[in-house]
C-alpha cells in the first residue's frame, strides 16, 4: 500500500534518498550527500511516498509562504511510475500553498 506523508528531512534515511535519486538518473544530486541534505533542509515542505515502508517517491517545495511557491524535485521510482504516485506527491506538496502564486 502506498502512503504519502509530509516529513522533515531527518525522517528520511540518507541511503534511501541516494537510491531514489539514482533510480531516476539524478545522480548529480546524490554525489554530494551534504548538499542534498542542505537542499532538503532548506525546503519549505518535503513530501515522501512509501510502498510497504520502501521510499518510492519525493517532492519538495521552496516558498516564502506569502507570494511564491516553487515545486521542486518530483521523483518517483521507475517501478512505480504511471500509478498516480507523482500526482499524489504534487497534490500533497502544494496543498499548504493554496493562496500562494505558483511558478
Where are these regions (language model features)?
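Short amphipathic alpha-helix that is part of the acyltransferase structural core
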Residues: 1-31
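Active-site phosphate/pyrophosphate- and oxyanion-stabilizing loops and adjacent acidic/basic residues
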Residues: 34, 91
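A short helix-loop-beta-strand connector motif used in the catalytic cores of GNAT acetyltransferases and
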Residues: 37-48, 101-102
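Conserved beta-strand in the GNAT
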Residues: 48, 54-63, 70-75
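A conserved beta-turn-beta hairpin within the catalytic core of GNAT-like acetyltransferases
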Residues: 63-71, 81, 100
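Conserved acetyl-CoA pyrophosphate-binding loop and the N-cap/start of the following alpha-helix
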Residues: 80, 84-89
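Conserved GNAT acetyl-CoA-binding A-motif
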Residues: 90, 97-103
